[in-house]
Swiss-Prot record:
Involved in metalloproteinase-binding: region residues: 21-25, 93-94
Protein name per the record: Putative metalloproteinase inhibitor tag-225
Keywords in alphabetical order: Disulfide bond, Glycoprotein, Metal-binding, Metalloenzyme inhibitor, Metalloprotease inhibitor, Protease inhibitor, Secreted, Signal, Zinc
Organism this protein belongs to: Caenorhabditis elegans
Signal peptide: 1-20
Glycosylation positions in this chain: N79
Name of the encoding gene: tag-225
Protein family (similarity comment): Belongs to the protease inhibitor I35 (TIMP) family.
Superkingdom classification of source: Eukaryota
Compartments where found: Secreted
Disulfide bonds: C21-C96, C23-C123, C33-C158
């Protein structure tokens, strides 16, 4: 009986590891330069089970849609004068979707899908190069963004 219990525990751990989000570690500059947009946002509303807007590459997937206020934009595509106030992310953890809370502020990065939909995932978020300040595969709540990183995102040249 103990062997069966131990086998079930090991199987559960292996399944969790297999289904977990996997990201490649990147430097602050690499994450910033690979992103289409980087912004200090305040999350107003989170809505589940959303499809991406018309013209997006990913079809039929369940997404979370966040309505945000862009407090400060550090990077945006040159063809956009402002960033849209909606951000989409996968609702499934294995697809590296972000679970962030309404009413909180974050440093977020992502890409533009289709004509003008902002899309973000856990991988590629702009984090400090000093990993003692945050964990890898993380999203930074703005109050935890080190002062050095706040200054750095204002001056990175790609």
């Amino acid at each position: 009986m103990q062997n069966l219990s131990l086998s079930l525990v090991i199987l559960s751990v292996l399944i969790a590891v297999t289904l977990a989000c996997k990201c490649r570690e990147q430097s602050t500059k690499e994450s910033f330069c690979n992103a289409h947009w980087v912004s200090h946002v305040k999350v107003k509303v989170r809505v589940g089970k959303q499809g991406l807007p018309e013209g997006s590459e990913r079809k039929g997937l369940n997404n979370l849609r966040y309505t945000v206020q862009h407090v400060e934009v550090f990077k945006k595509p040159s063809n956009m004068t402002t960033l849209p106030d909606e951000i989409f992310t996968p609702s499934e953890a294995p697809a590296c979707g972000l679970k962030i809370a309404a009413g909180h502020e974050y440093l977020l990065a992502g890409r533009v899908e289709g004509p003008n939909a902002l899309y973000t995932v856990l991988c590629g978020q702009v984090l400090p190069d000093d990993r003692s300040q945050t964990s890898f595969e993380n999203v930074l709540e703005w109050k935890n963004v080190p002062q050095t990183l706040q200054s750095q995102v204002k001056s990175i040249k790609c």
